[in-house]
C-alpha cells in the first residue's frame, strides 16, 4: 500500500471499535495497512531527534506489553489523543495476547499526532527479545514472518530518551556508567539494533537498586544496577529534577526511589495474568507537578486478560526487590 493512501482515521476507528467488547476480541487490519503504519511512523521517528525535548503538560505511561484492553483503559482515563499529550516509555509488545493491536494503535496515533504523541524504545522493541517472548509468534500466527521483520525495521528507528522541560529525564530502563553528556545520546545513529552492552543497552536495560553503592551487577544478566547516589549525582550534574523510567513490575503501578528523585512506572495491570499489580500513568502539569492515575487490577472473572494466553508458559521478567508484587499462589514465575 502506498503510505500516502493510508486511511488513518479508518484504521484508528476500527482499532477503537472493540471498546466495550469483552477483552480479547481481535482487530485484524490488512497486512498492507500494518506495513504502511510501520513505514510512515519510521519516517517520523527518523525526522525527530533520538533524544526528544518535550514540553509539559503530558501523560507518561510505562510498559504495556500487548495488554490492548488495558491500553484502551489508559486512554479512557487520560483522554484519547489529541485530548492529552502522551509519552510512552517502551515495551509495547510481548507477553500479552494482543501485541499487534497495541503497537498498531500507538503507531497510528504517532502518525496522526506527530507533535503530541511520543513513543520511546523499550528493551522488547528489539528483534532478539521479541523473537522469544511472544511478538514473533503472534506475527507468524496472524500474518507472516515478513511482517515481523517490517516491525523490526520500524523499532530500530525509535527514539531512546526524552527530556521534559529540561527537568525530567525519561527512558525505558535507566542510567549508564558510560553516560557523561546528553550529546552521547544524540550521537547514536539510527537505524540501530540494541547492542548487548554500552550506552544504548543500558538506557533500555538498567535498573535502580537501593542496596547498591555505585554500579552493580544486574540479575537480568544484561547491563547494570545503580544506587541512589548515582541518581543524585546524575541529576545534579545535568540540572535535572527527576528520572522517569519503566522496565520493572511495581505493585502500585508507580514506585519512587532515591528520595523521590526517580520514579518507576508500569502500566500493565495484572501483568501477564500472574501478578496482582496495578498499572499507572503519570500526569505532568505545566508547573511540572506530577500526579498518578491508577488502573486497578481488573476483576479476573470479568476480564480474563493474560491468564493462560500467549506468554503463560514464558518466564516473567522478575521484579527486583519488589516482594509485594510477587505472583499469586500457583502462578508460574
UniProtKB/Swiss-Prot annotation:
Subcellular location: Cytoplasm; Nucleus
Tissue/organ expression: Expressed in gonads, nervous system, intestine and muscles.
CDD domains named in the record: MPP_PP1_PPKL
Record-listed Mn(2+) 2 binding positions: 63, 91, 123, 172, 247
Activity regulation behaviour: Inhibited by okadaic acid.
GO cellular component, one term: cytoplasm
Lineage top rank: taxon: Eukaryota
Compositionally skewed regions (Low complexity) per UniProt: 322-333
Cofactor note as given: Binds 2 manganese ions per subunit.
Keyword terms: Cell cycle, Cell division, Chromatin regulator, Cytoplasm, Developmental protein, Hydrolase, Manganese, Meiosis, Metal-binding, Mitosis, Nucleus, Protein phosphatase
Region of interest (Disordered), residue spans: 306-333
Effect upon mutating residue 252 to N: In yp14; temperature-sensitive. Embryonic lethality in 6% of animals at 20 degrees Celsius and in 41.6% of animals at 25 degrees Celsius. Fertile at 20 degrees Celsius, but sterile at 25 Degrees Celsius
BP GO annotations: cell division; chromatin organization; meiotic cell cycle
Molecular-function GO terms, alphabetical: metal ion binding; protein serine/threonine phosphatase activity
Enzyme class at the top of the EC tree: hydrolase
Family as reported in the entry's similarity comment: Belongs to the PPP phosphatase family. PP-1 subfamily.
Subunit: Interacts with lab-1; the interaction is direct. Interacts with knl-1; the interaction is direct.
Name the UniProt record assigns to this protein: Serine/threonine-protein phosphatase PP1-beta
Organism of this sequence: Caenorhabditis elegans
Amino acid at each position: 500500500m502506498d503510505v500516502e493512501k493510508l486511511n488513518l482515521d479508518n484504521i484508528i476507528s476500527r482499532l477503537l471499535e472493540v471498546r466495550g467488547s469483552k477483552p480479547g476480541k481481535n482487530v485484524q487490519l490488512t497486512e498492507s495497512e500494518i506495513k504502511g503504519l510501520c513505514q510512515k511512523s519510521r519516517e517520523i521517528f527518523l525526522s525527530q531527534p533520538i533524544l526528544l525535548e518535550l514540553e509539559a503538560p503530558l501523560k507518561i505511561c510505562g510498559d504495556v506489553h500487548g495488554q490492548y484492553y488495558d491500553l484502551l483503559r489508559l486512554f479512557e482515563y487520560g483522554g484519547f489523543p489529541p485530548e492529552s499529550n502522551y509519552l510512552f516509555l517502551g515495551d509495547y509488545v510481548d507477553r500479552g495476547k494482543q501485541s499487534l493491536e497495541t503497537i498498531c494503535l500507538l503507531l497510528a496515533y504517532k502518525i496522526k499526532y506527530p507533535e503530541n504523541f511520543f513513543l520511546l524504545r523499550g528493551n522488547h522493541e528489539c528483534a532478539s527479545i521479541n523473537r522469544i517472548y511472544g511478538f514473533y509468534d503472534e506475527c507468524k500466527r496472524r500474518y507472516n514472518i515478513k511482517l515481523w521483520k517490517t516491525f523490526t525495521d520500524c523499532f530500530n528507528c525509535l527514539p531512546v530518551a526524552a527530556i521534559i522541560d529540561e527537568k525530567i529525564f525519561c527512558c525505558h530502563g535507566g542510567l549508564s556508567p558510560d553516560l557523561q553528556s546528553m550529546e552521547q545520546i544524540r550521537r547514536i545513529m539510527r537505524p540501530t539494533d540494541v547492542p548487548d552492552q554500552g550506552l544504548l543497552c543500558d538506557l533500555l536495560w538498567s535498573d535502580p537498586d537501593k542496596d547498591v553503592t555505585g554500579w552493580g551487577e544486574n540479575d537480568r544478566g544484561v547491563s547494570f544496577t545503580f544506587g541512589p547516589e548515582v541518581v543524585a549525582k546524575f541529576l545534579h550534574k545535568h540540572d535535572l529534577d527527576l528520572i522517569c523510567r519503566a522496565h520493572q513490575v511495581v505493585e502500585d503501578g508507580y514506585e519512587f526511589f532515591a528520595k523521590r528523585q526517580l520514579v518507576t512506572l508500569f502500566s500493565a495491570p495484572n501483568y501477564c495474568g500472574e501478578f496482582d499489580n496495578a498499572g499507572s500513568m503519570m500526569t505532568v502539569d505545566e508547573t511540572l507537578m506530577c500526579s498518578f492515575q491508577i488502573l486497578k487490577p481488573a476483576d479476573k472473572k470479568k476480564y480474563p486478560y493474560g491468564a493462560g494466553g500467549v506468554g503463560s508458559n514464558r518466564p516473567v521478567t522478575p521484579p527486583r526487590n519488589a516482594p509485594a508484587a510477587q505472583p499469586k499462589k500457583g502462578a508460574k514465575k
